[in-house]
Amino acid sequence: MAPKAEKKPAAKKPAEEEPAAEKAEKALAGKKPKAEKRLPAGKAEKGSGEGRKAGRKKAKKSVETYKIYIFKVLKQVHPDIGISSKAMSIMNSFINDIFEKLAGESAKLARYNKKPTITSREIQTSVRLVLPGELAKHAVSEGTKAVTKFTSA
């Protein structure tokens, strides 16, 4: 169903402009109005204001990722191999997922033991619970080594 044409209040126009205006209205009556140009999501027109002071640019939201650290580890292990952006995104998601699981498990352990603080002991136990077998043993030994190095330096 086509939208009804908008009715405008009658206003007196000069005699010479009436025929041109009527012709334009008749021509547009059967056609759909042109769609306005849309801006990408999150961007507004410069003149619209949108709660910000005119002339100021919107501050970029900082997004923290593990990409630089993944790349550094890759170069330590395989200096001659690169990584695609899609693979980097997958690795970043993987690390975020593991971090979330470990943090959740550590929080549960602290709650069970009625402790207000998550210590290295809770982290170590959660690593043993979340990661399987040999991987957990290696992760615990590497973590212990890293904490020892951090506290001695």
Swiss-Prot record:
Modifications the protein undergoes after translation, according to the UniProt entry: Can be acetylated to form H2BK6ac and H2BK33ac. Monoubiquitinated by BRE1 to form H2BK143ub1 and deubiquitinated by UBP26. Required for heterochromatic histone H3 di- and trimethylation at H3K4me. May give a specific tag for epigenetic transcriptional activation.
Residue spans of biased composition, Basic and acidic residues class: 1-28, 36-53
PROSITE patterns named among the record's database cross-references: HISTONE_H2B
Domain of life: Eukaryota
GO MF assignments: DNA binding; protein heterodimerization activity; structural constituent of chromatin
Entries under InterPro entries matching the protein: Histone-fold (IPR009072), Histone_H2A/H2B/H3 (IPR007125), Histone_H2B (IPR000558), HISTONE_H2B_site (IPR055333)
CDD domains linked to this entry: HFD_H2B
Keywords: Acetylation, Chromosome, DNA-binding, Isopeptide bond, Nucleosome core, Nucleus, Ubl conjugation
Subcellular location field: Nucleus; Chromosome
Span list, region Disordered: 1-61
One Pfam family cited in the UniProt record for this chain: Histone
N6-acetyllysine PTM positions: K7, K37
Cross-link (Glycyl lysine isopeptide (Lys-Gly) (interchain with G-Cter in ubiquitin)): K149
Gene Ontology cellular-component annotations: nucleosome; nucleus
Assembly notes: The nucleosome is a histone octamer containing two molecules each of H2A, H2B, H3 and H4 assembled in one H3-H4 heterotetramer and two H2A-H2B heterodimers. The octamer wraps approximately 147 bp of DNA.
Family: Belongs to the histone H2B family.
Role: Core component of nucleosome. Nucleosomes wrap and compact DNA into chromatin, limiting DNA accessibility to the cellular machineries which require DNA as a template. Histones thereby play a central role in transcription regulation, DNA repair, DNA replication and chromosomal stability. DNA accessibility is regulated via a complex set of post-translational modifications of histones, also called histone code, and nucleosome remodeling.
Protein name: Histone H2B.3
Organism phylogeny: Eukaryota, Viridiplantae, Streptophyta, Embryophyta, Tracheophyta
Encoding gene, per UniProt annotation: H2B.3
